[in-house]
Curated annotation (Swiss-Prot):
Known role: Required for formation of the rod structure of the flagellar apparatus. Together with FliI and FliH, may constitute the export apparatus of flagellin.
Gene Ontology annotations of biological process type: bacterial-type flagellum assembly; protein secretion
Topology versus the membrane: Multi-pass membrane protein
Subcellular localization: Cell inner membrane
Calcium is among the record's keywords: no
One Gene Ontology term, aspect cellular component: plasma membrane
Keywords: Bacterial flagellum biogenesis, Bacterial flagellum protein export, Cell inner membrane, Cell membrane, Membrane, Protein transport, Transmembrane, Transmembrane helix, Transport
Protein encoded by which gene: flhA
Family statement drawn from the similarity comment of this UniProt entry: Belongs to the FHIPEP (flagella/HR/invasion proteins export pore) family.
The protein's name: Flagellar biosynthesis protein FlhA
Parts of the chain that traverse the membrane: 24-44, 45-65, 71-91, 121-141, 209-229, 247-267, 296-316, 478-498
Pfam families associated with the record: FHIPEP
Length: 696
């Protein structure tokens, strides 16, 4: 007995168990069994009672649900309950036809009760009641709910693109985070699936009502044939017995069907609020005392008409008038009015104390636009700038190896109407102008002729440009100008600024998130690396040094392997950066020179190189004249390199690379300083020009 109890014991935590997985298959098996196997009357009583209880539960859940998606399983439940009722009809029909001649209890006590007590044992009344229930279910509730579900599905599908764009806009504006955006997108998808399912599920109920009417006719006709032909019953006795059993069977199935249809109507007609259906009805029906008073007045007039049931009308008149008077007094009582006035005065005179919520943290990256540029960042007005910026962030992450911060875009009345500002931590790092509806014609250096328009400079690279009207677009292209839209101008400028400040935008939080991301892919390599082998601060500084010189950090495996090899003996971030750069020599060479076998670089004179090495080893600085001369010669070499179509790269001794890079970075940010150890094998190096110090 104890073993049996232990076998039958259900798990305590149903949600974490696998018992729920069996619910669907068990129910399907039960339905098929009822259709195929003959059931005893007692089991039919249990199943009919279970069907009624299930329908009441579904209706109550629909009533207490606050949002439609809180009962997203309703279409599936509707299908299962419909199949359950039909299978019960099949099982009860079988037992009525087989055992109906034995008496009214042949199909169980539940069918007998519905056939006798609820309709007084009169099969004519039972047929009328049954037909009325079917008409209510089929013509009123089901038809209305089906139409609402159809229209709701159409509107939900039509509104999906707008909802998705609104979610993307909120995400790009920083109003919500990525997790909230995923949650909202999932809800939009679930809502669409729900109303689409409800549109089809409503057909189940309509078909169930039609099937119930046909089963009634089949049972009556079949019962007469079986009773008279097989059991030699009198026609009147057969008609009375089988009709009452059929009516009981029909009523015990149609009443749950009516309840389920009502639940479907409640689900599709409700509006999502913080209240359930009952609270909405009570709050909105009985909150206005004038409505109750007017209703009481109309009922009172009807109650005074001769021949009317005066007591009933006057009773409800008094009840509604009393309720209206009570609500009116409650709304207009001195205490309530005084409380409202006090709250209003307190609200006006309240001194709001400063709190930590008033401290506004600066966004890592943001953009402010003038009011004429607002349509460009508004998805509802077909603005495409948000999508372009999202694409730039994704491309940057793929190329440089980390995801930059979300760009918070806002309008600012202090910014000129057609201007914009790009800010990093609240400080402007770029600005420009854009004119929606016009085109920017950029002169790449080989354009011929002039164009009518507003002369300006392209904000990203400072090239001469002209804002032109759409009518001059083709002419500008023919003359050799590069013509771009206003949104492209801003997007290109933003991309340039993003790459320019890649190192400063890479903070400790980004370093931690990147390390966590790598840890998921390479758990053995990253195990015990931080903080046992090196600190997060050192890793952050090394990666920041790489980004400061436009070196991508995509190859984190190579970076971490180099750090793991040298970090135990070396803790200086600058020295570790040099080691990592050598390990990344293939990526660095590929980044600056592509697949070219011959690479053209700017060289450093051997004499100047020895002089710089001696100065570095002795700790002394360079003479001002020599430093100025090196800077000027580097500038001339970069110009010649760019005019010849080459990449501005200075190749120096490995020991001098870091020093010269820091020295030349401010005046020549476009110049990349590489060491001879950072060039991958198999590349032929050709010096196009030489920086020779004072003797050049």
């Amino acid at each position: 007995m104890a073993n049996l109890a232990s076998l039958l014991r259900l798990p305590g935590n149903w949600k974490s168990s696998q018992w729920q997985i069996l619910a669907g298959p068990v129910l399907i098996l039960l339905i098929l069994s009822m259709m195929v196997l003959p059931l005893p009357p007692f089991l039919l009583d249990l199943l009919f009672t279970f069907n009624i209880a299930l329908s009441i539960m579904v209706l109550l859940v629909a009533m207490f649900t606050r949002r439609t998606l809180d009962f997203a399983a309703f279409p599936t439940i509707l299908l299962f309950t419909t199949l359950l009722r039909l299978s019960l009809n099949v099982a009860s029909t079988r037992i009525i036809l087989m055992e109906g001649h034995t008496g009214s209890a042949a199909a169980g006590r539940v069918v007998e009760a519905f056939g006798h007590f609820l309709v007084g044992g009169n099969f004519a009344i039972g047929i009328v009641v049954f037909i009325i229930l079917i008409l209510i279910n089929f013509m009123v509730i089901t038809k209305g709910a089906g139409r609402i579900a159809e229209v709701g599905a159409r509107f939900v599908l039509d509104g999906m693109p707008g909802k998705q764009m609104a979610i993307d806009a909120d995400l790009n504006a920083g109003i919500i985070n990525e997790e909230e955006a995923k949650k909202r997108r999932k809800e939009v998808s679930l809502e669409s699936d729900f109303y689409g399912s409800m549109d089809g599920a409503s057909k189940f109920v309509r078909g169930d009502a039609i099937a119930g009417l046909m089963i009634l006719v089949i049972n009556v006709v079949g019962g007469l044939v079986v009773g008279v032909a097989q059991h030699n019953m009198a026609l009147n006795d057969a008609a009375s017995t089988y009709t009452l059993l059929t009516i009981g069977d029909g009523l015990v199935a149609q009443i749950p069907a009516l309840i389920i249809s009502t639940a479907a109507g409640v689900i599709v007609t409700r509006v999502a609020t913080d209240e359930d259906v009952g609270q909405q009805m009570v709050t909105q029906l009985f909150d206005n005392p004038r409505v109750l008073m007017l209703t009481a007045g109309v009922l009172g007039l009807l109650g005074l008409v001769p021949g009317m049931p005066n007591f009933v009308f006057l009773f409800f008149t008094a009840a509604l008038a009393g309720l209206g008077w009570y609500i009116l007094k409650r709304h207009s009582s001195p205490q309530v009015q005084q409380q409202k006035e006090l709250e209003q005065v307190e609200k006006q005179n309240r001194v709001v104390e400063a709190s930590w919520e008033d401290v506004q943290l600066e966004d890592p990256l943001s953009m402010e636009v003038g009011y004429r540029l607002i349509p460009m960042v508004d998805n509802r007005q077909n603005g495409e700038l948000l999508g372009r910026i999202s694409g730039i962030r994704k491309k940057f992450a793929q190329e440089m190896g980390y995801l930059p911060p979300v760009v918070h875009i806002r309008d600012n009345m202090e910014v000129k109407p057609s201007s914009y500002r790009i800010l990093m931590k609240g400080v402007e790092i770029g600005h420009g102008e854009a004119h929606p509806g016009r085109w920017l014609a950029i002169n790449p250096g080989n354009a011929v002729g002039t164009l009518e328009g507003d002369n300006t400079q392209e904000p990203a690279f400072g090239l001469p440009a002209v804002w032109i009207d759409d009518s001059l677009r083709e002419q500008a292209q023919v003359q050799g100008y590069t013509v771009v839209a206003a949104s492209t101008v801003i997007a290109t400028h933003f991309n340039h600024v993003l790459n320019q400040y890649a190192a400063e935008l890479f903070g400790r939080q980004e370093a931690q998130m990147l390390f966590d991301r790598v840890s998921k892919e390479l758990p053995k390599m990253t195990e015990n690396m931080i903080p046992d082998m090196l600190s997060l601060t050192v890793l952050h500084k090394v990666l920041q040094n790489l980004l400061a010189e436009q070196v991508p950090i995509r190859d984190m495996r190579t970076i971490l392997e180099a750090l793991a090899e040298h970090a135990p003996e070396q803790k200086d971030p600058a020295e570790l950066t040099a080691v990592v750069r050598v390990a990344l020599r293939r990526a660095i060479t590929q980044h600056w020179f592509g697949d070219k076998e011959e690479i053209q670089v700017i060289g450093l004179d051997a004499g100047l190189e020895r002089l710089l090495l001696q100065a570095m080893q002795s700790g002394g600085g360079l003479e001002p004249g020599l430093a100025e001369n090196i800077e000027q010669q580097a500038l001339d070499a970069v110009r010649r390199q760019e005019m010849s179509g080459g990449v501005p790269v200075l190749l120096v001794n490995h020991a001098l690379r870091s020093l010269l890079s820091r020295f030349l970075r401010r005046s020549l940010p476009q110049l990349a300083v590489l060491s001879n150890m950072e060039i991958s094998e198999g590349r032929h190096i050709r010096m196009t020009s030489m920086i020779g110090g004072q003797n050049n």
